[in-house]
Amino acid sequence: MFDFDDLSQAIARQTVLCVGDLMLDEFVYGEVSRISPEAPAPVIAVQRSETNIGGAGNVARNIAALGARGIFVGLVGQDAAGDQLEAELAKVDGIESVLVRDPSRPTTRKVRFVSEHFSTHMLRADWERAAPASEDIEQKLIAAILPLIARADIVLLSDYAKGVLTARVLRNVIDATRRAGKRVIVDPKSANLAIYRGASVLTPNRKEFSEATRSRAETEQEIAAAAQDAIYLADCEAILVTQSERGMTLVPRQGDPIHVPAYPVKVRDVSGAGDTVVAVLAAALAAGAAWEDALRMASAAAAVAVSKQGTASVTSAELRRKILPHAYRAAEEKIIENDGELATRVAVWRSEGLRVGFTNGCFDILHPGHVKVLTAARAACDRLVVGLNSDTSVKRLKGESRPVQDERARAEVLAALEAVDLVAIFTEETPLRLIELVRPSVLVKGGDYTREQVVGHEVVEAAGGEVLLIDILKGHSTTALVDRARSDQR
C-alpha cells in the first residue's frame, strides 16, 4: 500500500547528487495588442519579469523542495549570468553547489516572452554555446564530481546537450557510481542511448524516445516493444517514457510495463516539468520506493508543475494535496505548523483576490457559542484563519486545570469545521503576532468587547480592514461545561 507520509519522510533523509547543464531562465510577461509600425512584428507591453534557476539547476531545486539534500555540479561562463546563478543557488536551502567556470563560453541563458493573460509563449531568445566541454573543462568536472558520489544515495544526470555531460564525463561518472553500488538516473538528450550505457534508468520524453528507437510507438504495448532494444543497448534497468497528457510508461528489463496516467489539470506552463519528474523519481527511488509508488509521486509532481507559471519546483506539501484524497487530508492540512507556511497560504489567497478573516480563542470544549462566532466570521470573509491558544497559553489564562483537551485535539476539532480554513497555534497570551502576520481584512471577536478592546484592531484598521463584533450566545461557556462535569462526578 502506498503510504505518502512514510515515503515523504524517507525522501527527506536522502542526498541526491545532480550533474548537468545549468541555465538561467528568464520570463518576461506582458500583453500584445498591436503590431509594430516598424515591422510586421507584435509589440509586447511588458508588465513584469522573473528569473529562475533552470535546466539541471531546476532539477536540484525540485530535490531540495521535496526536503531532500541536493548536491549540484554544473558549468557556467565567466560572466554576469554565471554570477547570478551562483548567487541564486546559494540562496536555496538544501542545495550545495559546485560550479566549474569556463571563460570560453557564455552561461546558458533563455529569455521567454509570455502572454500574461493566455500563458502563451510568444518568443524565446537563447544565449548559449551548445558544444561539448573542452578536455581541460571535462577534467575539472570529473575531478569535482567523483569525490561527491560517496556522499550521495543516488546520482542524477540531467542532459540538455549544452556541453557538460560529454561521453568522457558520462563514462567516468556512471562507472564510478556503479562501482559504489548506487543507482544512476539519466534524463537523456542524445538519441544515441549507448553513451548512457550502465545507467539504471533513462527518462526520455515521447519525442526523444521516438528519435532514439526510430519508432512511432504510441500505445503502451508499442512503447514496451520498442524499449526492449534500447534497454539492451543502454544496459539499463528500465526506461521511463514521459508522454505529457498521456501519462508515463515504465518498461523494466524484467517484468511487465507499468503505465501511470496523467492527472487531469489545466496546463499553464510546461517549462521544467520534465525536471520535476526526474527529480521526484530519483528521490523516491533513493528512499526505497517501489516503481509504482515512485511513478505515482512523479506523475502528481508533473501535474503540480505544469499548473504553475515559469520554471517551477514542487514541494512535499503540494504533492500531498495532489495525491491524497480530499476527505483524508482536508482537516489536517488546515493546521499550520509555522509562520512561513501561514504567510505563504495567506499570500496565495490574496493573490486570488480573496478576503481573509481572523478570529481567535481557546476553544477547549467546542459548544454552540463557538460555532455561532465561527460561522458569522466565515460569512464575513472568503477565507477564515483561527488563532488557537497553545496549552501553555491556556494554562496562563484559565488556570492549571485547563485545557481539558490538548492543543492538537482542539486544532483537529476546529479544522474539521467547514467554516474554518486554517488553524494557527500561538503560544503568547494574545494573538497580536499572528494578526500582524496575517493582516486580515476583517478581525472578528465574540463577546462583550468594544472595538478598541479587541487585540490587534489598530493593525487591521491601519491596513484598511474592519473589526466585527459578534454577540455571544447566552448560556454557553466552556467554563460552565467543565464545572458541571466536575460537579456530576462528585
UniProtKB/Swiss-Prot annotation:
Q: Where are the transmembrane segments?
A: none
Keywords on record: ATP-binding, Carbohydrate metabolism, Kinase, Multifunctional enzyme, Nucleotide-binding, Nucleotidyltransferase, Transferase
The enzyme's main class, written as a single word, is: transferase
**Keyword ATP-binding on this protein?**
yes
Any one GO CC term of this protein is: cytosol
Which biological process terms from the Gene Ontology are attached to this UniProt entry?
A: ADP-L-glycero-beta-D-manno-heptose biosynthetic process
Catalysed reaction equations from the record: D-glycero-beta-D-manno-heptose 7-phosphate + ATP = D-glycero-beta-D-manno-heptose 1,7-bisphosphate + ADP + H(+); D-glycero-beta-D-manno-heptose 1-phosphate + ATP + H(+) = ADP-D-glycero-beta-D-manno-heptose + diphosphate
Pathway annotation: Nucleotide-sugar biosynthesis; ADP-L-glycero-beta-D-manno-heptose biosynthesis; ADP-L-glycero-beta-D-manno-heptose from D-glycero-beta-D-manno-heptose 7-phosphate: step 1/4; Nucleotide-sugar biosynthesis; ADP-L-glycero-beta-D-manno-heptose biosynthesis; ADP-L-glycero-beta-D-manno-heptose from D-glycero-beta-D-manno-heptose 7-phosphate: step 3/4
Catalytic residues in the record = D275
What does this gene product do? Answer: Catalyzes the ADP transfer from ATP to D-glycero-beta-D-manno-heptose 1-phosphate, yielding ADP-D-glycero-beta-D-manno-heptose.
Q: How does it assemble?
A: Homodimer.
The entry's family comment says: In the N-terminal section; belongs to the carbohydrate kinase PfkB family. In the C-terminal section; belongs to the cytidylyltransferase family.
Instruction: Quote the protein name from its UniProt record.
Output: Bifunctional protein HldE
Lineage runs: Bacteria, Pseudomonadati, Pseudomonadota, Alphaproteobacteria, Hyphomicrobiales
